[in-house]
Design a protein with these regions (language model features):
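Amphipathic alpha-helical polymerization modules
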Residues: 1-147
Length: 147
């Protein structure tokens, strides 16, 4: 494995770590606001989701003056607010209840957020394992060269 490919592996996996960290923060924010009936914007909290996009690296090759594109990792494209309707829950006496006793609650399912959190955690761990494997291979290669 050459130095360029080693750095590429670290860059790609590092971008995955950063993206999954942001995703986990967004999920934690969703869980923390699962019962927030009032936000500064007005109305209940809206669930947020992370949208990823792939990053392309442009590389120049001697035989190809125009260069080539190859995958170079992932980045957070944007954080989207859900357009799903709010949950209406019957809670008479709640300060935000309408005349019939219903309160608009955030469109957050804590169970789904926990599933997403496990998925994000596993992706984070996979990227970390790739980085650790790459470092281990490089250390072994250096020890072979040093003998």
């Amino acid at each position: 494995m050459g130095i360029d490919s080693t750095l590429s592996v670290l860059d790609i996996s590092g971008s995955g770590l950063s993206a999954e960290r942001i995703r986990m923060n967004v999920i934690a924010n969703n869980i923390a606001n699962a019962n927030a009936t009032e936000t500064p914007e007005g109305g209940p909290y809206r669930r947020e989701q992370v949208e990823f996009s792939s990053v392309l690296n442009r590389t120049m090759q001697k035989s190809n003056v125009k260069g080539t594109e190859r995958l170079g990792g992932v980045k957070v494209q944007r954080i989207l607010k859900s357009t799903e309707p709010f949950n209406r829950v019957y809670i008479p006496g709640h300060p935000k209840a309408d005349a019939k006793g219903f309160v608009e609650m955030p469109n957050v399912s804590v169970m789904m957020e926990m599933v997403d959190l496990v998925t994000a955690t596993r992706s984070y761990e996979a990227n970390l394992a790739v980085i650790n494997s790459s470092k281990e291979m490089n250390n072994r290669a250096l020890s072979i060269i040093g003998k």
